[in-house]
C-alpha cells in the first residue's frame, strides 16, 4: 500500500511488506544508480553472486515489469563480473511467471513447486510414489530451459519462511529419502541450515522456523 512520510505528509511512498520498508522505485534513474553502486561495492570485494529476495515484487503484482527490472540488475552486474551467479526467490508455481522471470537472463530461481511441506519432494516421500514428482520435474525443466537455455533450477526442501522438514517427516529413513531426492535432482541444491541434522521447528520467539 501507500503511506505518508510521518514528518512530511506531502511525501507519499509505497510499502507492501511494512511501513518501515519503502519500496525501491525502479522507474527512477537515481534508484538504479544507487543499486549499481552497491552491487559494484560488493563485487569489487570478491562477492561471487547474489541471492535476490522476492524478485516477483520488484514491481508489486506485475511480474512482467519485475522481470524487466531484474534483467537490468543482472546485466549491470554482469558488466562488473562476467561470471557472476544470481539466484532469485519467486514464490510462485505459475509457470507463466516463472518463465517470465527466467527470460530476464538470471541464472537460477528457487523451484517452489518442489519445496515446502506441500511440495513434490515431501509428497513423494510420504506417498511412496515419485510419479507426480517425475512428471512435474520433466515439465518444469523443459519450460524453464525454453525460457532461458542456461537456466539452473534451484531445488530445496524448506526455507526460513516455512515449517522445517523435520516436522513433517518424523522417521529417519524419510528424511534421508527426501535429502537423496532433492540432492540428486538436476540443478543446484540448497540446504537450509539444520536440515542436515533433521532439525524441527523450535516454537519460540517471533520466527520459530529459524
Feature locations, PLM:
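Substrate-binding/active-site clefts of carbohydrate-active enzymes
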Residues: 1-45, 69, 73-79, 83, ...
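Active-site rim elements
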Residues: 22-28, 58-60, 164-173, 179
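Hydrophobic (often cysteine-bearing) scaffold residues that line and stabilize catalytic clefts
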Residues: 31, 66, 190
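Short acidic/polar active-site loop segments enriched in Thr and Asp
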Residues: 48, 189
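Active-site-proximal helices and loops of the catalytic beta/alpha 8
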Residues: 51-149, 153, 171-172, 180-184, ...
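Ligand-binding/active-site lining segments
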Residues: 156-157
Amino acid at each position: 500500500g501507500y503511506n505518508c512520510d510521518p514528518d512530511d505528509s506531502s511525501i507519499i511512498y509505497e510499502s507492501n511488506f511494512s511501513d518501515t520498508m519503502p519500496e525501491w522505485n525502479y522507474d527512477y534513474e537515481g534508484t538504479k544508480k544507487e543499486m549499481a553502486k552497491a552491487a559494484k561495492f560488493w563485487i569489487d570485494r570478491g562477492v561471487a553472486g547474489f541471492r535476490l529476495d522476492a524478485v516477483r515484487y520488484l514491481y508489486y503484482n506485475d511480474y512482467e515489469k519485475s522481470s524487466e527490472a531484474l534483467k537490468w540488475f543482472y546485466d549491470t552486474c554482469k558488466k562488473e563480473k562476467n561470471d557472476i551467479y544470481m539466484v532469485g526467490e519467486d514464490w510462485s508455481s505459475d509457470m507463466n511467471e516463472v518463465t517470465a522471470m527466467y527470460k530476464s537472463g538470471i541464472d537460477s530461481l528457487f523451484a517452489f513447486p518442489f519445496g515446502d511441506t506441500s511440495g513434490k519432494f515431501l509428497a513423494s516421500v510420504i506417498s511412496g510414489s515419485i510419479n507426480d514428482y517425475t512428471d512435474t520435474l520433466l515439465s518444469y525443466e523443459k519450460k524453464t530451459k525454453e525460457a532461458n537455455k542456461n537456466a539452473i533450477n534451484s531445488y530445496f526442501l524448506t526455507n526460513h519462511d516455512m515449517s522445517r522438514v523435520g516436522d513433517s517427516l518424523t522417521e529417519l529413513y524419510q528424511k534421508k529419502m527426501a535429502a537423496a531426492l532433492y540432492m540428486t535432482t538436476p540443478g543446484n541444491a540448497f540446504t537450509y541450515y539444520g536440515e542436515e541434522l533433521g532439525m524441527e521447528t523450535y516454537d519460540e520467539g517471533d520466527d520459530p522456523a529459524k
